[in-house]
């Protein structure tokens, strides 16, 4: 077996509803790999149906790390994910296996391979000041305040993106420097590649980057609609109603803002009718998939496989098997 520092990590990325989890579970049953979840909703406890959490039967066949371990009231950042993932990667390598990181939260994948800019810790006083501004004048006023000091970051954020707006303005008020300047200084990118594996300057391990995604976007949209309706039939409304019974939870928490949960929460708040909730949930999921494609198209040396083509899925499985064999043979 290779020295631990030379052992690769395997990335299986892709848009929502592309079949990543099913393929990963299949692979984990026959290959020397362990799965690490890379989905920002699935890190939270209590988000099951709407987050497409694997069933208990599936988890018995293929356990997932970083799954359902965080309380909904606890923030979980990309930096938190990177720190946790690196610990689990080392453990999996020590177990004589390869980590297969599976999910659609590309921000987490980027944080892992590129590292993160050194930013100041959250400051409760500054956050309270920004929250007071939002309460008094609305989040568009926060967006405008950010645009005046950090136009680059403001241009890529919507006035409704409360969490990121708050963080960007907080960073400026704490440091006097725009968030965009920190990111520009921290340009961690691909440094070299060999035998299909990439070496990123922010990570000590070689990386196999793969994506499972349909070429037919209409097919994906159909799958999104079918799955959202299946979630409703499986009890998504009851799941959210149970969450609403917990007084510490509210609609502004990151987990509750996840696609599907947000629309159901707002429906139960009486903001719109059931049919509108269904339509909004499906549209929001399509928009999520579009954003995921946008991120993935920028990923260096990403190997794409068509999730709607059995032979392509088999080829992806074969590539994972080949990398395992090259390490452990």
UniProtKB/Swiss-Prot annotation:
Q: Which cofactor does it need?
A: Mg(2+)
Give the Enzyme Commission number. 2.5.1.75
Record Gene3D superfamilies: 1.10.20.140, P-loop containing nucleotide triphosphate hydrolases
Positions marked as site (Interaction with substrate tRNA): 105, 127
InterPro entries named in the record: Dimethylallyltransferase, IPT, P-loop_NTPase
- Identify the residues that bind ATP: 14-21
The segment annotated Interaction with substrate tRNA runs over: 39-42, 163-167
Q: Which reaction does it catalyse?
A: adenosine(37) in tRNA + dimethylallyl diphosphate = N(6)-dimethylallyladenosine(37) in tRNA + diphosphate
Positions contributing to substrate binding: 16-21
Q: Which domain of life is it from?
A: Bacteria
Which terms are listed as keywords in the entry?
ATP-binding, Magnesium, Nucleotide-binding, Transferase, tRNA processing
- Give one GO term, molecular function aspect: tRNA dimethylallyltransferase activity
* Similarity section: Belongs to the IPP transferase family.
Question: In UniProt terms, what function does this protein have?
Answer: Catalyzes the transfer of a dimethylallyl group onto the adenine at position 37 in tRNAs that read codons beginning with uridine, leading to the formation of N6-(dimethylallyl)adenosine (i(6)A).
Q: Which NCBIfam families match?
A: miaA
This chain's protein is named tRNA dimethylallyltransferase
Write the gene name: miaA
